[in-house]
């Protein structure tokens, strides 16, 4: 995860973690990141995630809910933030291929989540992708079948 957008996801994860655990205002979180002068990130994308996830939290949690094995408030806070970022991208950024969304989320979970958190994140977001990106999911499966 070395590109600007990947770094924006990492920063958004950190900001959303603060928002989830401490209820800190996203404007203040954004200012903290500006003051830190984090270089090499897509700041506009960071802001989109940092603001978009809280704004659409209800919709995101509703989308994730059927695939979770427990209530969302009982999911590890880091993994919860990663799942919400992934669900946001799957729902709101259709130009980003679902495989990219899943791979980025898995990498975040490997770096910041619990020992096997990446498996949990992958399993949940894969099911969300099948639901909300059904056409993209089916066309990828069809291409694979045609190649064999």
From Swiss-Prot:
InterPro entries: NusB-like_sf, NusB_fam, NusB_RsmB_TIM44. It comes from the Bacteria. One of its GO terms (biological process) is transcription antitermination. One of its GO terms (molecular function) is RNA binding. Keywords: RNA-binding, Transcription, Transcription antitermination, Transcription regulation. Belongs to the NusB family. Involved in transcription antitermination. Required for transcription of ribosomal RNA (rRNA) genes. Binds specifically to the boxA antiterminator sequence of the ribosomal RNA (rrn) operons. This is Transcription antitermination protein NusB. It comes from Nitrosococcus oceani (strain ATCC 19707 / BCRC 17464 / JCM 30415 / NCIMB 11848 / C-107).
């Amino acid at each position: 995860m070395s590109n600007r957008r990947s770094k924006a996801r990492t920063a958004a994860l950190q900001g959303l973690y603060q928002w989830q655990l401490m209820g800190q205002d996203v404007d203040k979180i954004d200012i903290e990141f500006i003051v830190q002068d984090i270089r090499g990130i897509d700041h506009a994308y960071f802001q989109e995630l940092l603001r978009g996830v809280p704004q659409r939290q209800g919709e995101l949690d509703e989308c994730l809910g059927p695939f979770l094995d427990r209530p969302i408030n009982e999911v590890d806070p880091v993994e919860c933030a990663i799942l919400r970022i992934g669900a946001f991208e799957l729902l709101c950024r259709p130009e980003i291929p679902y495989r990219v969304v899943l791979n980025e989320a898995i990498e975040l979970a490997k770096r910041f989540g619990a020992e096997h958190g990446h498996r949990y994140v992958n399993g949940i977001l894969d099911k969300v992708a099948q639901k909300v990106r059904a056409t993209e999911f089916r066309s990828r499966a069809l291409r694979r079948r045609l190649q064999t």
